[in-house]
Amino acid sequence: MATVLDTPVAVRRAAMDLLARREHGRAELSRKLRQRGASAELIDPALDRLAEEGLLDESRYLESFIASRARSGHGPLRIREELAQRGLPRADIERALGACEVDWSAQLREVWRRKFARLPQDAREKAQQGRFLAYRGYSMESISRLLNSRSDD
């Protein structure tokens, strides 16, 4: 049932099928096409053409990815790392994170409230809450600020 990606038309069709499901970055789309058996000689021109036509857009992909992860409660550090692992340039990632309209501190408070809903009673609980929030991708500085301001209330 696997289609053979040995012509430019087949590679373009496979790329468009993937893009129809969700936005992809160029590196991710190239990797997926290679996994399906397409050669680099066919992939690069197809992706160049899709980019020229506006169907493959890195900035749109970054915006979509950041918004999706932010809605899931992930912080900027985790999002930045996930995007870097997907082969996107750091400068583009930083630009997209700077342009997004997410209030990271408000989101941090909301993630904390949904998960814990009560102040840490001792150092062990405070460390547990801090580890969870750090794993979600928030900076230790903002976590400390949140937990210390909460314990002062």
Swiss-Prot record:
GO terms for biological process: regulation of DNA repair. It is found in: Cytoplasm. The keyword Transcription does not apply. The keyword DNA-binding does not apply. Keywords: Cytoplasm. GO terms for cellular component: cytoplasm. Pfam families: RecX_HTH1, RecX_HTH2, RecX_HTH3. Belongs to the RecX family. HAMAP family: RecX. Modulates RecA activity. This is Regulatory protein RecX. It comes from Pseudomonas aeruginosa (strain UCBPP-PA14). The lineage of its organism: Bacteria, Pseudomonadati, Pseudomonadota, Gammaproteobacteria, Pseudomonadales.
